[in-house]
């Protein structure tokens, strides 16, 4: 996240699945863990999910095949998720006598509380079309078009200013679900005032008026 030469991150699985869920060897070890050991183990996943969700750079999930349990959480924690019709999702923890606690903040934000009630409680699998309908997937395309769609999305993303993208991600997290009142009006007005007066903001507006590319686009040629 600190490397300025990296403009965005694409999260993808290696093989026929995006993420097939928990490793069986880990599950065997976990079965004998104490509550403290389980807490420490869960915090590892929790911190990873938190880091992904709070990355300052845009994140895009490239989803094909199964994305089960934590895999569904990884998709939800990304800013954008592009998937193919063979993508399938499930939060099956209840069938193991467990709950999807660690991934719940991200999944609920991505697909909504009502849908979370259904899929957390039933553990049902749901397909890519349903994930797209719920908003867990932001784009759905055929497998042969997946890389093209990802690259097109990436092109749109990196056309934005680096600092603008960072501030937009923070803006969405801070503004979502907030009451629209005088405090919010002042907050958002200050945000736009600050970025308009910034070096990047001035460069972007100047480039638009002068009908040229902004300086930040030179680094992606």
Predicted segment positions?
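Hydrophobic, secondary-structure "cap" segments at the distal end of domains
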Residues: 105-114
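Short helix- or helix-capping micro-motifs
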Residues: 20-22, 115-124
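Glycine-rich beta-to-alpha active-site loop
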Residues: 49-98, 125
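Acidic-histidine catalytic/liganding microenvironments
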Residues: 3, 55-56, 211
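C-terminal long alpha-helix characteristic of the crotonase
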Residues: 82-87, 137-186, 199, 215-221
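A short, well-ordered alpha-helical element
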Residues: 1-7
């Amino acid at each position: 996240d600190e490397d300025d030469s990296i403009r965005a991150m694409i999260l993808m699985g290696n093989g026929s699945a995006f993420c097939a869920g928990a490793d069986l060897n880990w599950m065997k070890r976990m079965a004998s863990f104490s509550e403290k050991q389980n807490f420490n183990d869960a915090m590892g996943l929790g911190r990873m999910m938190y880091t992904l969700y709070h990355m300052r750079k845009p994140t895009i999930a490239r989803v094909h095949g199964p994305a089960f349990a934590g895999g569904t959480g990884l998709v939800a924690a990304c800013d954008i998720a592009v998937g193919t019709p063979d993508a399938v999702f499930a939060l099956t923890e209840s069938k193991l006598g467990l709950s999807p606690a660690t991934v719940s903040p991200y999944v609920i934000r991505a697909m909504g509380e009502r849908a979370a009630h259904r899929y957390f409680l039933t553990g049902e699998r749901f397909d890519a079309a349903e994930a797209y309908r719920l908003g867990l997937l932001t784009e759905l395309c055929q497998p042969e078009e997946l890389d093209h769609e990802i690259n097109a999305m990436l092109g749109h993303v990196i056309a934005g200013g680096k600092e603008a993208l960072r501030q937009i991600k923070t803006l969405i997290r801070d503004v979502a679900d907030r009451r629209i009142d005088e405090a919010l009006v002042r907050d958002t007005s200050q945000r736009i005032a600050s970025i308009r007066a910034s070096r990047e903001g001035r460069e972007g507006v100047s480039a638009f008026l002068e009908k040229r590319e902004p300086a930040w686009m030179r680094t992606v040629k």
